A protein has these predicted regions:
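Central regulatory/effector-binding core of bacterial HTH transcription factors
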Residues: 57-71
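Basic (Lys/Arg-enriched) interaction patch that binds polyanionic ligands
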Residues: 114
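Periplasmic N-terminal soluble interaction domains immediately after the signal peptide in Gram-negative
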Residues: 100-104
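Exported/periplasmic ABC-transporter solute-binding proteins
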Residues: 16-55, 75, 106-109, 117-296
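Short beta-strand and adjacent tight-turn residues that come in two discontinuous sequence segments
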Residues: 65, 83-86, 91, 177, ...
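Pocket-flanking alpha-helical
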Residues: 68-99, 204
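Short, conserved beta-strand segments within well-ordered enzyme catalytic domains
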Residues: 35, 61, 80-83
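Sec-dependent bacterial lipoprotein signal peptides
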Residues: 1-14
Length: 296
């Protein structure tokens, strides 16, 4: 009788002896809690809805919060899975090495940060030099009130790291708590410029998206080496013509093939990537073909 067979028998007898033993979730059944960057709420709500329609015994409960808190949850065992805008960094991987855990992460899509202004604001077309000047406070052409969702959000980190290159945000920069509140504030203040995740304004079939885009103007940007001013739309995100581009990742630490693994696999599958495509992000795990239209 080999060791593998003995181990299997031990598991069976243990389960029979203790009928109240906690049942582990599987790739398609059970309940898990995940932490998700709040800029992705519309997208991930839709992904979960589709996944649970395919697997009715699966129950994924998301908590939407700032990205900093998502990684904190992953490190302190409050969440097995997080959905965020960056991969694990070297410090985080070193931590998992020390505790003998092998995390799994994957780029799912290319996403974008969108800038929105009041509908009465004439400055809805900007060069990247102007954006940098607004975000670090060096642009003195006019008064701007910058509004983010949260001081610990991924959009704040993105602007500080990728646009300001470590320079601080100007004094008076505001945090409005949520992306919808950013949009609401901008709609009521003519000098405001809001920084949000593009998935809040990218689904043209969603009534909430339509309401948001009717309230504010989405800023068109010109990349440093570009010639056209473009919005944060799927084609321009994919080609890199839209300059405020970032990734969408899952990070998973699951010691067995449980529901986190099942949901992660789904997100990278055809069905999961189709939802990403419908939200006008650029899928990283499937091909997107753009065809020229002949208008007559």
């Amino acid at each position: 009788m080999n060791a593998v067979y003995l181990a299997a028998l031990t598991i069976i007898f243990t389960a029979c002896a203790n009928p109240n033993a906690k049942k582990l979730d599987t790739a398609t059944e059970g309940t898990i809690h995940i932490s998700v960057d709040e800029t992705y709420k519309p997208l991930i709500d839709s992904e979960i809805k589709v996944f649970q329609s395919l697997y009715p015994q699966a129950h994924i409960i998301p908590t939407y919060k700032p990205e900093v808190e998502c990684f904190r949850d992953l490190l302190n065992d409050s969440a097995r899975m997080v959905i965020v805008t960056r991969d694990l960094n070297a410090e985080e991987r070193d931590y998992f090495d020390k505790v003998k855990i092998v995390p799994n992460s994957l780029l799912l899509a290319w996403d974008a940060v969108a800038l929105v202004v009041n509908r009465s604001n004439p400055d809805s077309v900007l060069k990247m030099d102007q954006v940098r000047g607004i975000m670090d406070g060096s642009n003195k052409d006019r008064k701007w009130q910058i509004v983010f969702d949260n001081a610990n959000s991924s959009t704040v980190r993105y602007i500080k790291d990728s646009i300001n290159k470590g320079k601080p945000l100007p004094p008076g920069t505001m945090a409005a708590k949520t992306n919808p509140e950013v949009i609401d504030y901008v709609s009521k203040n003519k000098d405001a410029i809001g920084v949000i995740g593009v998935s809040w304004i990218s689904d043209p079939s969603d009534s909430l998206t339509i309401d948001f885009t009717n309230k504010v103007t989405v800023v068109k940007l010109r990349a440093d080496y570009g010639s056209d001013y473009v919005g944060p739309y799927q084609y321009y995100i994919g080609t890199g013509a839209y300059p405020l581009k970032r990734g969408l990742f899952y990070c998973l630490k699951e010691p067995y093939h449980g529901l986190g693994t099942g949901f992660a696999t789904f997100l990278g599958s055809y069905e999961g990537q189709l939802v990403i495509k419908q939200f006008r992000l650029f899928p990283a795990r499937s091909n997107v073909v753009f065809r020229e239209a002949n208008l007559k």
